[in-house]
From Swiss-Prot:
Motif ('HIGH' region): 14-24
Keywords per UniProt: Aminoacyl-tRNA synthetase, ATP-binding, Cytoplasm, Ligase, Metal-binding, Nucleotide-binding, Protein biosynthesis, Zinc
Source organism phylogeny: Bacteria, Bacillati, Actinomycetota, Actinomycetes, Streptosporangiales
GO CC, any one term: cytosol
Record: residues binding ATP: 354
Function of the molecule: Is required not only for elongation of protein synthesis but also for the initiation of all mRNA translation through initiator tRNA(fMet) aminoacylation.
Protein name: Methionine--tRNA ligase
Cofactor(s) this protein requires: Zn(2+)
Gene Ontology BP terms: methionyl-tRNA aminoacylation
Length: 606
């Protein structure tokens, strides 16, 4: 096995019915970027892909309400979301969208392969329609009481309270989410994915993940196997990917269900990336090599799609379900190595809700605060393994106490004293036991933090990295180089050399978490070139969804290989010129808490 691993970082696709809020990016965004950046620094071949999920009824309904087409609405939020994720520093190799001709072609190929192998069949079911409009009500637009747990607010596809999968006809007292009326149920023909045909294969695969996956994800996924039922993969609507079969392709009101096409986006985005890089077959290194690895990042409400449905689709397309079959034209495809799910982030004790305006959008947040401050909070205090509440008081405290007073303070006092008194990185004289101990601990942290990051234990990894910062601050205070200036200037230079090496190490350890500020520290230490790559927007041109003509849309990409960052202690170079540093982070006034709470209450009450 090559020492360089091929690692697919597959990031859940944000839905393009509005801007994304900080709860969204705490689940799919920041954790996946921390992981991808670390793996790149470790020398691995990373492919990080995602895009906007643009089909389905919610977009169609919102577009109708605004008097625009579904396409226009998707175009608007595709751009807004892409701009916000770039501002947050998420290092996608490709962030695209589900309305490209490439995506349509790959989705239809997956459907065709599954159908040919016998894992898709048609069935007449009961579909909900609005009595007043005659329009179809997809399952997510039918609500009612869950027949399992009694929760009043279960959707027609799933109860968020107990996690059980449902159909609209299962609900007690069903009602339309749009206007509250009781829906009518009529016969309609749909295609179904035969999930029970994968029960044995899914069980064997999931049980092999014991000790590797987060316990909550594995337990939830195994429980899903107890209730495997065929699941509809088509819907009665005109906004989505056409069904690629004779007699169905041209039906105006039958489309593939949005969840079916969205999970295929990981594959279609990888194929699109390969085409854009000039090597159309390159995607296969991440999807078909036996030693390739794939990590899927999402919030816990999407576990079912990634640990049950998508693996079933991959097995069926590859001809590996209970009915056998042959791989489709793309070839056999790898199952996920790990499904990495975060829990939910709440806000000041309340569930995020765009409709009730209990929300802060990424764009609004970044207009007032630094991206790295948000990234730090999400990892340090976020919902990695349990639901967590975002509070402005805690955000301000962590920003001021941990970023400004701890890490920022170490950077400032170490570099400023060396720049002022020496003007460059000094030579190290003879090292004392204290010098060697703190340097050895700093070097050892790369293995400790790296092991945590490899296992997607981001909070623990950040704590270990910040422990290096704390020990460096302690060393600086105890050695008191400002006192040595007159009594022992050579010793002062040695202490400053050690302190600057610790700053350099800490910068490297914190790079996956805090890429923008790590670039600043690299420059403050006299570094040249790019330390760690940052994402950028590019305009892409493609025919959209098989329609006539072409469309221009933004994609996120970046140059992440051509930089200096690598996961090891890199010796600083004596003689490198130093300039007085600028503040690394902004200290926030306590008044921010009251201002933001007032802003939240005003919005929620509007």
């Amino acid at each position: 096995m090559s020492s360089k691993r091929h690692i697919l970082t597959a990031v859940a696709w944000p839905y393009a019915n509005g801007p994304r809020h900080i709860g969204h990016v705490s689940g799919f965004g920041v954790p996946s970027d921390v992981f991808a950046r670390f793996q790149r620094m470790s020398g691995n071949n990373v492919l990080m892909v995602s895009g906007t999920d643009e089909h389905g009824t919610p977009i169609q309904v919102l577009a109708d309400q605004e008097g625009v087409s579904a396409r226009e609405l998707a175009d608007r939020y595709n751009r807004i979301i892409a701009e916000d994720l770039v501002a947050l520093g998420l290092s996608y190799d490709l962030f695209t969208r589900t309305t490209t001709a490439n995506h349509y072609a790959v989705v239809q190929e997956l459907f065709t392969g599954l159908y040919r192998n016998g894992y898709i069949f048609s069935k007449t079911t009961k579909g909900a329609i609005s009595p007043s409009t005659g329009r179809t009500l997809p399952d997510r637009y039918v609500e009612g009481t869950c027949p399992i747990c009694g929760y009043d607010g279960a959707r027609g596809d799933q109860c968020d309270n107990c996690g059980k999968q449902l159909d609209p006809t299962d609900l007690i007292n069903p009602r339309s989410k749009i206007n509250g009326e009781t829906p009518e149920f009529v016969d309609t023909e749909h295609f179904m994915l035969d999930l029970p045909a994968f029960a044995e294969q899914l069980s064997e695969w999931l049980k092999s993940k014991g000790g590797e996956w987060r316990p909550n994800v594995l337990k939830f996924s195994l429980n899903l196997l107890d209730e495997l039922q065929p699941r509809a993969i088509t819907r009665d609507l005109d906004w989505g990917v056409p069904i690629p079969l004779e007699g169905w392709r041209d039906q105006p009101n039958k489309r593939l269900y949005v969840w079916f096409d969205a999970v295929i986006g990981y594959l279609s985005a990888s194929i699109e990336w390969a085409k854009r890089t000039g090597d159309p077959e390159a995607w296969r290194k991440w999807w078909q090599n036996s030693d390739a690895e794939s990590f899927y990042f999402m919030g816990k409400d999407n576990i079912v799609f990634h640990s049950e449905i998508w693996p079933a689709m991959l097995l069926g397309y590859s001809g590996k379900g209970s009915k056998g079959g042959e791989p489709g034209s793309l070839g056999a495809l790898n199952l996920p190595t790990e499904v990495v799910s975060s829990e939910f982030l709440t806000m000041e004790g309340r569930k995020f809700s765009s409709s009730r305006r209990v929300v802060i959008y990424v764009r609004d947040f970044l207009e007032r605060y630094d991206a790295d401050a948000l990234r730090y909070y999400i990892i340090a205090a976020g919902p990695e393994t349990q639901d967590t509440d975002f509070t402005w008081a805690e955000f301000v405290r962590r920003n001021n106490d941990e970023l400004v007073a701890t890490w920022g303070n170490l950077v400032n006092r170490s570099i400023s004293m060396a720049a002022k008194n020496i003007g460059h990185i000094p030579e190290a004289g003879e090292l004392t036991d204290a010098d060697r101990a703190v340097l050895d601990a700093s070097k050892a942290a790369f293995a400790t933090v790296g092991e945590r990051l490899n296992r997607a234990q981001f909070k623990a990894a950040l704590q270990e990295a910040m422990r290096v910062v704390a020990e460096a601050n302690k060393y600086f205070s105890e050695q008191a180089p400002w006192k040595l200036k007159k009594t022992d200037p050579k010793r002062m230079e040695t202490v400053l050399h050690v302190a600057l090496q610790l700053v350099s190490d800490a910068k490297t350890l914190l790079t996956p978490f805090l890429p923008a500020s790590s670039n600043k520290v690299y420059e403050m230490l006299g570094g040249t070139g790019t330390w760690t790559g940052m994402p950028r927007l590019e305009e892409a041109t493609d025919s959209i969804g098989g329609e006539e003509g072409v469309s221009t849309y933004p994609v996120i990409t970046g140059d992440y290989a051509d930089n200096e960052a690598r996961w090891e202690s890199i010796p600083i170079v004596p003689g490198t010129p130093l300039k007085p540093p600028t503040p690394l982070f902004r200290k926030l006034d306590q008044s921010v808490v009251d201002e933001e709470l007032a802003r939240l209450e005003a919005a929620a009450g509007a």
